[in-house]
Amino acid sequence: MFVSEDLTVNEKNHLVIGKNDTVELAKEFGTPLYVLDEDLIRKNCRVYKNAMDKYYGGNGLVLYANKAFCSLFTCRLVKEEGLGIDVVSGGELYTAIKADFPMDKVYFHGNNKTADEIELAVKNKVGNIIVDNIYELEALNETAKKYGVVQNIMFRIKPGVDAHTHSFIQTGQIDSKFGVAPVSYTHLTLPTIA
């Protein structure tokens, strides 16, 4: 049976990932077992990076969503492939730091960043912090002052759009817990960073 070029079922009816019989892997390593096909991951990284380069003239950065699978291996792999990384927690950021990921290619998201996580990001010179609310901006400003850092930021904006999808996954409406509402940023006075 053929599933895909990189994922097949062999004559023993065993799933094969990256030329590895998963039944044999389970016998050797036990279960549960995570099996990643490095060649396929690298191939997919290159597909996205090449498309970005082709259609945007190299003026973009593909980000790996570290919440998909956060490990030293994946951080190092996407670094080698020239991608950036999107982290949403102190643990994911810590893993990227330990993998010696280039901090200028790290984007720190998350709607509930702690003071310790903000400090870890600023102290390690994360490329961009995506600000989710005014309280986070104030905490970030204080931390940046403490370390004498001018931090690149982006705002996550609530566009006030009703996507007509399941209520559990709606995030663009004005009453979403994610992002800054337009009414919030029209009166926003950005703090001066020392």
Where are these regions (language model features)?
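Short, compositionally biased segments
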Residues: 182-185
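Single conserved hydrophobic/aromatic residue that forms the stacking wall/gate
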Residues: 187-194
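Phosphate/diphosphate-binding glycine-rich loops and adjacent basic-rich segments that engage nucleotide
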Residues: 152-153, 157-180
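A charged N-terminal "starter" segment
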Residues: 1-153, 167, 175, 188
